[in-house]
Amino acid sequence: IFGIWAGLVGTSLSLMIRTELGKPGSLLNDDQLYNVVVTAHGFIMIFFMVMPIMIGGFGNWLVPLMLGAPDMAFPRMNNMSFWLLPPSLTLLLASSAVESGAGTGWTVYPPLSSNLSHAGPSVDLAIFSLHLAGISSILGAINFITTIMNMRWEGLLMERMSLFVWSVFITAILLLLSLPVLAGAITMLLTDRNFNTTFFDPSGGGDPILYQH
């Protein structure tokens, strides 16, 4: 139900984006609002529709079935990772409602390093929302990798697994490799905005200055 609701919200945001792109200025007539819609649409469709429905629901049912396993390796972890998503969505909605919203188009952190253009708690709420959604995804990925590595019935070697199981396995590994990079970047952004660090160029533009001495 949560995934279906998120899908409907994401679809309505898609329609708004398509309408605005078809005839600019006809619907929203505000660049910042349009960017907020694009950003929210991306997050909602990925973290709150695709992850709970296609991976959390469908994958959790089909992968053990294809492995001959009675269940996932950590059934309770699925539950825990799902219940991180509603508060994450709440934070994302709160970020869009506070001030002018975190509108950055498809990317998240580069344009946000400047406190001048995005002052206030809106971006910080979006960052915390991403942290929760990322933790949820990482828990799910660990569960899938552990299940596929350890829960196959005897005789089902890795090369005999179905392509669907392989695709979930590789996707989970790539997720574990990529999400900490995003987490590090948005955490650096969070400290830049609130603790006076300078991981990103303080004059704006989003250029990292980590290795410049």
Swiss-Prot record:
Lineage: Eukaryota, Metazoa, Spiralia, Lophotrochozoa, Mollusca
Annotated positions binding Fe(II)-heme a: H41
Membrane topology: Multi-pass membrane protein
Mitochondrial intermembrane topological intervals: 22-42, 103-124, 184-213
Cofactor(s) essential for the protein: heme; Cu cation
Species in which this protein is naturally found: Loligo forbesii (Veined squid)
TM stretches of this protein: 1-21, 43-63, 82-102, 125-145, 163-183
Co-factor binding comment: Binds 2 heme A groups non-covalently per subunit.
E.C. code: 7.1.1.9
Identification of the protein by name: Cytochrome c oxidase subunit 1
Subunit structure of this chain's protein: Component of the cytochrome c oxidase (complex IV, CIV), a multisubunit enzyme composed of a catalytic core of 3 subunits and several supernumerary subunits. The complex exists as a monomer or a dimer and forms supercomplexes (SCs) in the inner mitochondrial membrane with ubiquinol-cytochrome c oxidoreductase (cytochrome b-c1 complex, complex III, CIII).
Domain of life: Eukaryota
